[in-house]
UniProtKB/Swiss-Prot annotation:
Gene: trpA
Active-site positions on this chain: 44, 55
Uppermost EC category: lyase
CDD domains for the chain: Tryptophan_synthase_alpha
Protein name: Tryptophan synthase alpha chain
Organism of derivation: Petrotoga mobilis (strain DSM 10674 / SJ95)
């Protein structure tokens, strides 16, 4: 059983997303350690990219800031290596395929294994476009985590279930991340439909920004993914590290509503 699968064995999961290098890599280290200490179950570490198609304005801004700081995939691996012994929860790398191609697929997999990465999410790489890549990371003990949306067909769900492991990333709306105005009424039906074809845990993301929303949603899913709301806190408090870490603690603790 993978480290990610272990998380879901006895409990629901709180999954958070941070952009590596926002506001800088030193602070990213401290944010990850704080999230780990505060009981976050899985941490997604975003690889900044110049044209992040699935990301809303908040995460786009964080990406731009990180790129301006000279953040590269190599530096991200170096940073995560420095804290890998202290982080007890699974780390998942999330990024666009171009970043990985530029780094070199074999190099990426080697570094991911050495850094103790548990899973990989690539929003712009459908499972049927690069089957070899997903097979390779799986062979190396890394979970390929795929995305589905409310309009994903039954046929596609069946195929995705053969490739995906760890958890399935269920996008709650059609659009970009951070849309907290998305209607939530369809989520029960959505989770029931996906569960007919997929037998791994379902985590829901896009638009979760409050304990109330988390409570309403977690009933139907195995985990919640919080990204833009956390990135906003980082952006608003990046000048005061002490306050930033306190705010992260307050916010993440408030989201564990189960």
């Amino acid at each position: 059983m993978s480290k990610i699968s272990e998380v879901f064995k006895n409990s629901k999961a709180l999954i958070t997303y941070v952009t590596a290098g926002d506001p800088n890599l030193e602070v990213t280290k401290e944010i990850i350690l704080e999230l780990n200490k505060d009981g976050v179950d899985i941490i997604e570490v975003g690889i900044p990219f110049s044209d992040p198609l699935a990301d809303g304005p908040i995460i786009q801004k964080a990406s731009q800031k990180a790129l301006k700081n000279g953040v590269t995939l190599k530096k991200i691996f170096e940073t995560l290596n420095e804290i890998k012994e202290e982080v007890t929860c699974p780390l998942v790398l999330m990024g666009y395929y171009n970043s990985i191609l530029n780094y070199g697929i074999d190099n990426f997999i080697t570094e991911a294994v050495n850094t103790g990465i548990s899973g990989v999410i690539i929003p712009d790489l459908p499972f049927d476009e690069e089957e070899e890549f997903y097979a390779k990371i799986k062979e190396n003990g890394i979970d390929p985590i795929l995305l589905v949306a409310p309009n994903t067909s039954e046929e596609r769900l069946k195929e995705i279930s053969k490739v995906c492991s760890g958890f399935l990333y269920c996008v709650s709306i059609m659009g970009v991340t951070g849309d907290s105005q998305a209607p939530m009424e369809h989520l029960k039906e959505y989770s029931q439909r996906v569960r007919k074809y997929v037998n791994i845990p379902l985590a829901i993301g896009f638009g979760i920004d409050s304990p109330t929303k988390a409570k309403n949603i977690i009933e139907y899913f195995d985990g919640i993914i919080v990204g833009s709301a956390l990135i906003k806190i980082i952006d608003e408090n990046s000048d005061d590290k002490g306050k930033l870490l306190k705010e992260i603690k307050r916010f993440t603790k408030s989201l564990k509503v189960w």
